[in-house]
Amino acid sequence: MPRFVDRVVIHARAGNGGNGCASVHREKFKPLGGPDGGNGGRGGSIVLVVDPQVHTLLDFHFHPHVVAPSGKQGAGSNRDGAAGADLEVRVPDGTVVLDEEGRVLADLVGAGTRFEAAAGGRGGLGNAALASRSRRAPGFALLGEKGQVRELTLELKTVADVGLIGFPSAGKSSLVSTISAAKPKIADYPFTTLVPNLGVVSAGDHTFTVADVPGLIPGASEGRGLGLEFLRHIERCAVLVHVVDCATMEPGRDPISDIEALEAELAAYRPTLQGDSTLGDLAERPRAVVLNKIDVPDARELADFVRDEVAERFGWPVFEVSTVAREGLRPFIFALWDMVRTYREAQPPVVPRRPIIRPIAVDETGFSVHPDGQGGFVVRGTRPERWINQTDFDNDEAVGYLGDRLARLGVEEELLRLGARPGCAVTIGDMTFDWEPQTPAGVDVQMSGRGTDTRLEQTDRVSAAERKIARRERRQSTDEPGGEE
């Protein structure tokens, strides 16, 4: 069973908004109590929250479906439905959120950082909220909006100041375990380290973090071995350290060729966070070289021989280190701290964001109408599509209310301007219907009363006046001679 997972695909489904309620107030001696249907509750959203106690995406590996609760339906007596609780999902520090097309949506760094992965749907209005002077007792309510459904990719990128890179069995894990309290798995065979290991290093009164990245091989930037997974974890490192094994050199290999091979892989790798200007490109970040395992006599001789050549060729500081004899570690640690401190001092000061008391207004009144190439038209826009989803098409009065809203927005006038004819197919969102214009362009649309809509040829709703006439006719029929006794 995997214990460390750094890339998962999750299916986030936010909660749906609750439907509004259509009800009439009933009380003794109050025959015209008026509408009292409550609004539906808001659906719960899915929020990703950085938790320092979480270090892997393992939970999502077994449970990729994340579902937030939906809002409750409104009720009579002006009772609003309960809102669905937001679902807070804990993720590790350094998690990057990508959409289905690979675009970066969020870079979650720092404890408590939040990102709304999927927004909950808004609750539908009850008939009490829909009442107006011309529609005093609406016989319908609006449906709740569907919650947002998204497929997101989560990638964990290690957050460390220094990244140790090198070929397998170069001694990176031994080095990080010696200069910090980290206890990675150490063995004398390649690819012992399969997951990044983090360690906190003390340099006097200062501390910084070091990441032991699993071994790299030529072709890692193209996915050979586990290269792409390994290279992902050095994107955030401000300083990169080449760890070279001077004790077990193979024929045709030397420290300089090893460094050049790894640099070629770093140059070919295209990080996900290409827009992170604070760190810059991988090729621009400061480097250092560690000639490791100098406790072996042949390794010390090789390190002394190539040290000046490496420094002259690459222009980076070079350190001869032995983790077994704990030789050369102190100057190496303080040199790393100087490089990390230089990076930190170059960063712009963090300016706290001012809280937004009044959110920025978003213009949702815009819409567009385009021919579909088959004699029909397609209407696109935030409001029209939302209104379609909120309409109960089994209720004639709700359909009439939708027509009023679309006409007031100008959709009908725009269709007439583009040459739409009665009976042509009009598509809004997921709904396609035959369009029948009821008002000429430029005429204000008057809201219809309860149970009546001039655009409907027939309605199954019986008005109060019709019921009164029916009762009068029944009484007259019983009073006539020969009627029921």
From Swiss-Prot:
A GO BP annotation: ribosome biogenesis
Transmembrane domains' residue ranges: none
List of residues binding GTP: 166-173, 191-195, 212-215, 292-295, 322-324
Residues annotated as domain Obg: 2-159
InterPro entries: G_OBG, GTP-bd, GTP-bd_Obg/CgtA, GTP-bd_prot_GTP1/OBG_C_sf, GTP1-OBG_CS, GTP1_OBG_dom, GTP1_OBG_dom_sf, OBG_GTPase
Keywords, alphabetical: Cytoplasm, GTP-binding, Hydrolase, Magnesium, Metal-binding, Nucleotide-binding
Binding site for Mg(2+): 173, 193
Enzyme Commission identifier(s): 3.6.5.-
One Pfam assignment: DUF1967
Record's subcellular location: Cytoplasm
Keyword GTP-binding applies: yes
Location of region: Disordered: 439-485
Cellular component terms (Gene Ontology): cytoplasm
Similarity field: Belongs to the TRAFAC class OBG-HflX-like GTPase superfamily. OBG GTPase family.
Subunit organization: Monomer.
The protein, known as: GTPase Obg
Organism of derivation: Mycobacterium sp. (strain KMS)
